[in-house]
Amino acid sequence: MATIESKLVEMLTVPVEALGFKLWGIEYIQAGRHSILRVFIDHENGINIEDCAEASRQVSAVMDVEDPISTEYTLEVSSPGVDRPLFTAEQYRAYIGEETKVQLTMPVAGSRNLKGVISSVDGQMLTITVDGKDLIVALDNIRKGNVIAKF
């Protein structure tokens, strides 16, 4: 069964791309009777507030017609930012050699929170080097992953 996030990605990719943006990813956070839908958009030249407003109007129109979420929710549209969330194998692959933190559904090496360097991505498996040790994590075991920004 597809998750609500995967259904939303399928539903919103074309409308967002029609505006010239890339749909970077979606987070749907259920919080009681009111939920949050975060839509991350990206562009090779960056994203500004006007881009977010334009994409928000487009996404809102699609959501009103398709109505995939039956409860109240707040729509947030933004760029992925410097500590960008990672959603796909392609995105993890693009950040090989970068430091990341991942929250897991099931523990790996006794931990659900890992912080290390992405070593490789093979299919749906991520290798992350944590304290000099390579750990292999299935991408579907990652609840949340983010690049750690360097300043």
UniProtKB/Swiss-Prot annotation:
An annotated GO cellular component: cytosol
Keywords for the protein's UniProt record, in alphabetical order: Cytoplasm, Ribosome biogenesis
Pfam families hit by this protein: DUF150_C (PF17384), RimP_N (PF02576)
Keyword Secreted (UniProt): no
Localization terms from the record: Cytoplasm
Keyword NAD: no
One of the GO BP terms on file: translation
Protein's job: Required for maturation of 30S ribosomal subunits.
HAMAP family linked to this entry: RimP
Homology family: Belongs to the RimP family.
PANTHER family noted in UniProt: RIBOSOME MATURATION FACTOR RIMP (PTHR33867:SF1)
Protein known as: Ribosome maturation factor RimP
Annotated source species: Shewanella frigidimarina (strain NCIMB 400)
